[in-house]
Swiss-Prot record:
HAMAP family in UniProt: KptA (MF_00299)
InterPro entries named among the record's database cross-references: Ptrans_KptA/Tpt1 (IPR002745), RNA_2'-PTrans_C (IPR042081), RNA_2'-PTrans_KptA (IPR022928), RNA_2'-PTrans_N (IPR042080)
Role, per record: Removes the 2'-phosphate from RNA via an intermediate in which the phosphate is ADP-ribosylated by NAD followed by a presumed transesterification to release the RNA and generate ADP-ribose 1''-2''-cyclic phosphate (APPR>P). May function as an ADP-ribosylase.
EC number(s) reported in the record: 2.7.1.-
UniProt superkingdom: Bacteria
Listed NCBIfam families: PRK00819.1-4
Family according to the record: Belongs to the KptA/TPT1 family.
Pfam families: PTS_2-RNA
Protein known as: Probable RNA 2'-phosphotransferase
Organism: Burkholderia lata (strain ATCC 17760 / DSM 23089 / LMG 22485 / NCIMB 9086 / R18194 / 383)
GO MF annotation, one: NAD+ poly-ADP-ribosyltransferase activity
Keyword annotations: NAD, Transferase
Length: 194
């Protein structure tokens, strides 16, 4: 196996990242894990809960996944004792307080064409999550949309929304968040070349 020091094979890193995302965003109770309102969980409790499910995760591997995750999904506390998902929570326990931020003129949302009729009628809604997630660039939005089917990119007139009283937040990993995006602020972009 040709992996660099402190690097996991891609399938292992992906599996661990997905497990952490599920537990820290959506279902901490499945392993008896307690999250505080800002989403922090004790690392030792997380590792013990995962072990009770018959899976092995040690601190060094956890730290490697956090440090090398391409989407920077996780944050470790300064003292190294706690971990949290940066954004994307659906569990009602977590009510992160992000500072309000001035958005760029345009933001982007990647989705699948099968969702367009609903989006045209209702705009973007957070669904089970606490916020609508927006990307600062087209490339990231395209990658997100591809995960759900035939992708389409929606351009968000973020500055106009902001001027009309909508609040934006930006998570530590650069993902922009807002409560909803009414359809009047959305524009479908031309389909990317395949």
């Amino acid at each position: 196996m040709n992996t660099k020091k402190n690097e996991l094979p891609a399938p292992d890193a992906t599996r661990i990242s997905r497990t952490l995302s599920y537990l820290l965003r959506h279902a901490p109770q499945t392993i008896g894990l307690q999250l505080d309102p800002e989403g922090w969980a004790d690392i030792d409790e997380l590792i013990a809960g995962i072990a009770r499910q018959g899976l092995h995760l040690d601190r060094a591997t956890l730290e490697t996944v956090c440090a090398t995750n391409d989407k920077q999904r996780f944050a470790l506390s300064d003292d190294g004792r706690r971990i949290r998902a940066v954004q994307g929570h659906s569990t009602p326990v977590v009510q992160r307080r992000y500072p309000a931020a001035q958005p760029p003129e345009r933001l982007y949302h990647g989705t699948a064409t099968r969702f367009l009729d609903s989006i045209r009628a209702q705009g973007l809604k957070p669904g089970a999550r606490h916020h609508v997630h927006l990307s600062p660039d087209i490339r990231t939005a395209l990658a997100v949309g591809t995960r759900y089917g035939v992708p389409v990119i929606l351009e968000v007139d973020a500055q106009r929304m902001h001027r009309q009283g909508h609040t934006f937040f930006v998570a530590e990993n650069g993902v922009w968040l807002t409560d909803t995006v009414p359809a009047e602020f959305l524009k479908e972009m031309d389909q990317p070349a395949r």
